Swiss-Prot record:
Region described as Disordered: 527-547
Biological process (GO), any one: protein refolding
EC number: 5.6.1.7
Name the UniProt record assigns to this protein: Chaperonin GroEL
Gene, per the UniProt record: groEL
Length: 547
């Protein structure tokens, strides 16, 4: 076991804060309409250029273990904000740094860290209520486009394309993003389906940055029962390997030896495979699997019809242009199903909806109908170079997530204005002691930082702008950093999803609270040994299968 380095008290927190500063300084430059790009070296290929806070944060790893512990904690605030709301990562980073730094100063001055935390939590809960009160629901295509435009750093085309995609498949519809083969940026609606089942093992992931498994032009095996042994599947697996195409297995479950064998072969490169549980339960599961079979022109392998896995040929497998699997969802895009068969299935489900008397059954049938007939909107992002396409694709994905958040919880005035004005009622909060009051004041000061940073990235004095806005009673009055003018933010279309603002603050406070209440830090002591040579990859030919 490696020996440990143990640090206590303010020394530990100070070193952690140094790591937090390093990460926050790299991330904060991306905030606002005049935020700058960050260039990140890749282990292979050309460098990545991004204005996405969480991408910058994820790329940072510090050599010093204690500083790195602080940086990783701050990174978790950005990552959580991205996971929950899809945006607000830079805001979360800026807030967390401000809260942690001010909190640490007070702990060093003798304030009780637990009471500081209680005061901070009181203040944050009050701000969250204020955000909910001031949020405005969005309905029109124009409002949806505004959110998409702001979340993509002012790219109007991205906002308009997202609004168009939502109009095509509905606000709750499935929208995916992929790279185009040309310069254009288009919206295409294709046959497709999404269901709420994710990969059965993280070892199936092909894109570790986004933690998703992406299968291009895969075969799809649909099996009604549980898979616990792969022996009956050997002939079909060998045929798939020979075809050099990926395989998606959808079954009631894949467990034990079968799952372990698939994972081993996926890691060794012999078989590009992923496995997910079938959606639904009981008879509904079977019906949904039949829907997928029709959508992908495959067969549901069911023992009721006397079908056995060992007799299945490649002709019984479904196919699709692409399948994307996350931890929670599977999206099948452009299944190879026959259009007439899909239409017949849709009519069959419609007649079942008309006949059923159960509201629950009707709701579930309508869900199936929406999945089968709604299709998938694909945002195809093009550009002149690979670097440009990847950078724009990242912005489209962020903007799409933020737009979904806006549809869910409404929008508030953007540009850091909502957080700034939400700090004003905090002075009236009742507390038990002066330490809790100090916790509230930490939050009041930190809420000014996102707006200050946006203004400073635009080349103006943040403190002066904050002072001017606090004198104004209109909560929507703010500073348009793009045009360098004071405006009504809502009327000017400068809006943020309420969910993004709320999540950024809650995640930042959670991380800052952890830092100020940390008294002891234990990390591995730096090793004097030279780092081992990296293992060389290599997997030739079709061999190496381990069934």
């Amino acid at each position: 076991m490696a020996t440990k380095l143990i640090k206590h008290g303010s020394k530990a927190r100070e070193q952690m804060l140094e790591g937090i500063d390093i990460l926050a300084d790299a991330v904060k430059v991306t905030l606002g309409p005049k935020g700058r790009n960050v260039l990140i070296e890749q282990s292979f290929g050309s460098p990545k250029i991004t204005k996405d806070g969480v991408t910058v944060a994820k790329s940072i790893e510090l050599k010093d273990k204690i500083r790195n512990a602080g940086a990783q904690l701050l990174k978790s605030a950005a990552t959580k904000a991205a996971e929950v709301a899809g945006d607000g990562t830079t805001t979360a980073t800026v807030l967390a740094r401000a809260l942690a730094r001010e909190g640490n100063k007070l702990v060093a001055a003798g304030y009780n860290p637990m009471d500081l935390k209680r005061g901070m939590d009181l203040a944050v809960n009050a701000v969250v209520e204020e955000i909910k009160k001031s949020s405005k629901k969005i309905n029109s295509q124009e409002e949806i486009a505004q959110v998409g435009t702001i979340s993509s750093n002012g790219d109007k085309e991205i906002g308009e394309k997202i609004a168009k995609a939502m109009e095509e498949v509905g606000k709750e519809g499935v929208i995916t993003v992929e790279e185009a083969k040309n310069f254009s940026f288009d919206v295409e609606v294709v046959k497709g389906m999404m269901f709420d089942r994710g990969y059965l093992s993280p070892y199936f992931v092909t894109n570790s940055e986004k933690m998703v498994a992406e299968l291009e032009n895969p075969f799809i095996l649909l099996f009604e029962k549980k898979l616990s042994n792969l022996q009956p599947m050997l002939p079909i697996l060998e045929a798939v390997v020979q075809s050099q195409r990926p395989l998606l297995i959808i079954a009631e479950d894949v467990e034990g030896e079968a799952l372990a064998t698939l994972v081993v072969n996926r890691l060794r490169g012999g078989l590009k495979v992923a496995a997910v549980k079938a959606p639904g339960f009981g008879d509904r599961r079977k019906a949904m699997m039949e829907d997928i079979a029709i959508l992908t022109k495959g067969e549901l392998i069911t023992e009721d019809l006397g079908m056995k896995l060992e007799n299945v040929s490649i002709k019984s497998l479904g196919t699709a242009k692409r399948v994307t699997i996350s931890k929670e969802n599977t999206v099948i895009v452009d299944g190879n199903g026959d259009k007439k068969n899909i239409e017949d299935r849709v009519l069959q489900i419609k007649s079942q909806i008309a006949e059923t008397t159960s509201d629950y059954d009707k709701e579930k049938l309508q869900e199936r109908l929406a999945k089968l007939s709604g299709g998938v909107a694909v945002l195809k992002v093009g550009g002149a170079t690979e670097v440009e396409v990847k950078e724009r694709k990242d912005r489209v994905e962020d903007a799409l997530a933020a737009t979904r958040a806006a549809v869910e919880e409404g929008v508030v005035a953007g540009g850091g204005v909502t957080l700034l004005h939400a700090s004003q009622p905090l002075t009236k909060l009742k507390v038990e002691n002066k330490d809790q009051q100090a916790g509230i004041e930490i939050v009041i000061e930190a809420l000014k930082d996102p707006l200050k940073q946006i203004v400073e990235n635009a080349g103006e004095n943040g403190g002066v702008v904050v002072g001017k806005l606090l004198e104004h009673k209109d909560k929507n009055y703010g500073f348009n950093a793009q045009d360098m003018q004071y405006v009504d933010m809502i009327k000017a279309g400068i809006i943020d999803p309420a969910k993004v603002v709320r999540t950024a603050l809650q995640d930042a406070t959670s991380v800052a609270s952890l830092i100020i209440t940390t008294e002891t830090l234990i990390v591995d002591e730096p090793s004097d040994k030279a780092e081992p040579m990296p293992m060389r990859g290599g997997m030739g030919g079709m061999g190496g299968m381990d069934f």
